[in-house]
Amino acid sequence: QAFEETMNKAVRYQGTAFCHIHSISSDVLKGRMLQPSLMEVDRSFRRCLIGGTFDRFHSGHQLLIQTALRQADFIEVHVVNDEMAQTKGGWIQSLDDRMETLLSWLSDTAHLRYEVHVLNDPHGPAPTHRTADCIVATVETIPRCHQINERRYENGLPPLSILEAPHLSDELGGILSSSRIRLGLIDQEGHPWIPPSYEGKILRMPAVLDDEFKTPMGELFEGPEDAPEVALSAMLEALPENHGTLVAVGDVTVKGLMDMGVLPDIAFIDGQTKREALDASLLVRGDAYAQQRSVVNPPGQLTPELLDVVRWALEQDQSVLVEVDGEEDLAPMFVLATAPLGTIVVYGQPRQGVVMRILDMEAKHRARNLLVHFEAEG
């Protein structure tokens, strides 16, 4: 209801569209956020057009819009519809979710100087827009803006001034973008999910986190310990039809899935359950997997070698079995921190059942918040 009220106040759903843009102000490249009052700047333009998907609304999006607000009296933001957005790949937020986040930010930042519309085709209103006098673009989208101006010429309209804005770099050295966020590399401010100071270090879990790890990190499917197929069956029924990589952690969980005809894309095992060696009949068949790797990771720790293997496994196109010499219980932490959004992580919860987590931004934030409490050595 709150979203509908916001939409009624701020948005007119019209079939309008133009070019997709990502951008920032050059001030950010000097290490500063763009903070001067938007009301105190002399503006050169009346109405600026902005277009984009605005998935995982991030700092680059904010600075793009701020650039337009600094140079135009009024802005029109055109948001790609669901059908067009899905051509960019999976795990893109719905139009409603993207609109809600954008509108919330605009209401605090742009006051009454904006409209928001739905973008239903590549060019939309730009070729025939009679009141717009500028458009924002990055170097990649400038050619499309020239196409728009050619169509405006054919329609007897003056060209739009093209405001070129540079990209914003994330802390890993790439361009801050929604696609890199969906790939699980960075958050919406461009920060990596594993702090750089933790790279190459042995991470030891402090005792104060014991209770935290007793809380399931996803949806719990209950079932008896001596019949794991009960919980696993319920989990598989809840598994989305379209999902990312399936990662299973723990011998009982991995073998249970395999016995039910489901081969995880990535499996982590250590040959134990409750730190006791498994009977030979309960061991996972390694020959079922296309690739196998071994790694040392002592109990209560996360090693750099395990992190390297997790990253490697996530890049593979074939199934991977990772045999851990030590303990794999904490492996989900590295998976949650490094895997793309939409990845499915499944692991056993002692005496309760099986946990399934569909990797989203909330799960990544929780993983990072826990990791920063680990003691880094080396």
Feature locations, PLM:
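Nucleotidyltransferase catalytic core that binds NTPs
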Residues: Q1-S233, P240-N242, D251-V254, M258-D259, ...
